[in-house]
Amino acid sequence: MKLKITILSLVISFLPSISFADAYIENKHGKITWRDCKLFYVYDDYKKDEIIPTIRYIETISNFTFRKWKKSMKKQPHIEIYYLGSSDSNVLGRTTLMDSHNKARINNVYVSMFTKDQDVLLHELLHGIGLAHSDDPNSLMYPYDSENQVLTEQDLINIRNIPCGSKV
């Protein structure tokens, strides 16, 4: 089975952003999508009160619901979230989307965190459900971290329009 990997990172920098033409992550087959709106998650080295509020918040602004993943569900697509401690680079978090057979369907997502900052976690989890970077420096989805970034109205519209399940 061939796997295609897409990596997205949030970096601390004051360099100008590369502008993104589309609001959703794409590969050569189209927009990356989940086959179901019910997603499973598992996390390591996070406390429940550090991660669950972010997951519940995403449920309120998207079409997705989240349930805790169990080892017996190995074949079920899921999001794995890992805190890896601090990094020597400026990378705060990284999301790796995996799709099999070169299709635009997500099998698994791996979120690697180098900080426990809630905004960075939200940014990376939104990549995990399919949202790309924004070219708006005020947006939480802007690829470079700065003070006072929020989810903009356009971000919220894009999040609600991420296709999943029967909406694909």
Model feature map: region roles:
Residues 19-168:
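Zinc-dependent metalloendopeptidases
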Residues 2-20:
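Classical Sec-dependent N-terminal signal peptides that target proteins to the secretory pathway
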